[in-house]
Amino acid sequence: MARVSVVFSDVSIAFSQEEWESLDLEQRNLYKDVMMENYHNVASLGCFISKPDVISLLEQGKEPWKVVRQRKPCPDSETKDETNQVFSENGIYEMNLSQWKIMERIGNSGLKSLLLKNGWESRRKQERQEDPQEGYLSQVRHTSERVSSYEKRALTTRQRIHFVEKPYECNECGKAFRVRQQLTFHHRIHTGEKPYECKECGMAFRQTAHLTRHQRLHSGEKLYECKECGQAFIYGPELRAHQKLHTGEKPYTCRECGKAFRVRGQLTLHQRIHTGEKPYVCQECGKAFRQLAHLTRHQKLNVVDRLYECKECGKDFLCGSGLRVHHKLHTGEKPYECKDCGKAFRVRQQLTLHQRSHTGEKPYECTECGKTFSRGYHLILHHRIHTGEKPYECKECWKAFSRYSQLISHQSIHIGVKPYDCKDCGKAFRLLSQLTQHQSVHAGEKPYSCKECGKSFRLRQKLALHQSIHTGEKPFECKECRKAFRLNSSLIQHLRIHSGEKPYECKECKKAFRQHSHLTHHLKVHTVKV
């Protein structure tokens, strides 16, 4: 009996590099499953001799787009036209990269139609022959059933993705995944396993795809170029993220504070600020970090005592970028200048934040009271007023603070150190900011002016407090009687009415007062008597 020749290229699917990199992990795994299934099914027919390059690459964990797949000529000239006819619509073709068209292309490979046609042709020839080849027909039927079984599993996989079922759960942290391979990759975070090593620099990676991308750093290969500005990138996702700079698109928004990001990864990292999640733990000291890069820098610090040292003053830094910014202190370099007022900055981020003082932009809004802020960090600090959170505690007296800077300032009370002296009057201060504020007294400088009435102030905080007179805002409310105040200090004094607290006591007559000003006024009574 003459058999219809089947070659693996007829039932394989070719991807260009760009197409392959646009697939997500589930699609790549499904592709690998299909190719291996097709290979075993066709091999079971005994139709080709050597293992195809694409199968070798997949077995080695390499990316299959590197292989240029071409059709091999059918060895049976009599059946060549028949084979081509079978695959005329299911051969290799240019692909539309919509998500499910890719999946359909993978799932609907022409293997089943070929095998069913082969089975029908075989049965037709069997009827014309006196000696049927039952063994071959059984093999065709069995292989057909295997392909049908695969198609059912492919459908199940697609359905599982559609309904977002995540059956594979990590025993270490409970995180769940849709695909088993994702769980395998994730496990390596906990075990620290990095089986793929770069031969150039020795750097190791958890996934072979990460190694492939890394190797482009050594080759200098930049395949992705921006059509707007001509800038080239090593990775496709880098180009896509860069293009959003031109469009201004920020599709990923934080539900907690409303901040928007160009890249989903930036949103994921940002959300850990709200959740407090720190998944990366140093096995040496137990310290945890929100980002893997922060853990990596920390671990380098443990290995090398002084990683990045300033040659001018000897100060050490965790990373090279920190040293470069610091070095501008010595050179006086301030390359980022504000076009509105001419003020210059060492760091671009400082300029961005400064420009909001001109535009009045305050993108961060408190969901509790509606107050807006120009910086996300200020919103986080403000939110602690509503929650009452005070995460920074003094180990000397156990007093707690909502800000780390407040704790540092407080600790100098116990130490008694005042390292900052005023050259004009000799007065000493615990903090440099206190000295700076004090020096404006000698200079007579009042740089902060109210736009409503023109009154000037030495401190920005004083201006902010003054402006509440014009706005009528009273954000500090007493929970006992609902009375509201412009100043937090006024609320604190008012609360003593309800609590009966009188912390200021006269040493002469032991009389106590709620406010320090009342004590000062009272002391005059004793002075007059003397």
From Swiss-Prot:
A zinc finger (C2H2-type) spans 168-190, 196-218, 224-246, 252-274, 280-302, 308-330, 336-358, 364-386, 392-414, 420-442, 448-470, 476-498, 504-526. One of its GO terms (cellular component) is nucleus. Gene3D superfamilies: 6.10.140.140, Classic Zinc Finger. One of its GO terms (molecular function) is zinc ion binding. The keyword RNA-binding does not apply. Pfam families: KRAB, zf-C2H2. CDD domains: KRAB_A-box. Residues 6-77 form the KRAB domain. One of its GO terms (biological process) is regulation of DNA-templated transcription. It comes from the Eukaryota. SMART domains: KRAB, ZnF_C2H2. PROSITE patterns: KRAB, ZINC_FINGER_C2H2_1, ZINC_FINGER_C2H2_2. Keywords: DNA-binding, Isopeptide bond, Metal-binding, Nucleus, Repeat, Transcription, Transcription regulation, Ubl conjugation, Zinc, Zinc-finger. There is a cross-link at residue 125 (Glycyl lysine isopeptide (Lys-Gly) (interchain with G-Cter in SUMO2)). It is found in: Nucleus. Its main location: nucleus. PANTHER family: ZINC FINGER PROTEIN, ZINC FINGER PROTEIN 37 HOMOLOG. May be involved in transcriptional regulation. Belongs to the krueppel C2H2-type zinc-finger protein family. This is Zinc finger protein 82. It comes from Mus musculus (Mouse).
